[in-house]
Regions:
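Conserved phosphotransfer cores of two-component systems
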Residues: 44-47, 69-76
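Short hydrophobic/Thr-rich beta-strand motif most characteristic of the beta2 strand and flanking loop
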Residues: 27-34, 42
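Receiver (REC) domain active-site loop signature in two-component systems and cognate sites
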Residues: 58
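Conserved sequence signature across two-component system core domains
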Residues: 9-10, 33, 52
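Charged docking surfaces used in two-component/phosphorelay signaling
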Residues: 17-25
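Acidic catalytic/metal-coordinating carboxylates
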Residues: 35-38, 62-65
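Active-site residues of response regulator receiver
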Residues: 55, 82
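Active-site beta3 strand of CheY-like receiver
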Residues: 47-53
Length: 83
């Protein structure tokens, strides 16, 4: 059975690692992005992402902007994350 993909987007590498480590232990495949623009690129390259976990405050494109853009074309579940 193929692992479900989750895209974790945060400009803080320590936060991405914390979330990634937890999800990997739960048998998910984790993709990572360090900003909103990178997240958009990955999301549209990888067609079968099951969930996005987005930081609210990021450089280039914040989590709310990413959420709005993705909602134009997809109903994928999105969890907004903030410190």
């Amino acid at each position: 059975m193929e692992k479900r993909k989750i895209l974790v987007v945060d400009d803080e590498s320590r936060m991405r690692k914390l979330v990634r480590d937890f999800l990997v232990k739960k048998n998910f495949r984790v993709l990572e992005a360090g900003d909103g623009e990178e997240a958009m690129d990955i999301f549209y390259e990888e067609k079968d992402i099951a969930l996005l976990i987005l930081d609210v405050m990021m450089p280039k494109m914040d989590g709310w902007e990413v959420c709005r853009e993705i909602r134009k074309n997809s109903k994928v579940p999105i969890i907004m994350l903030t410190a």
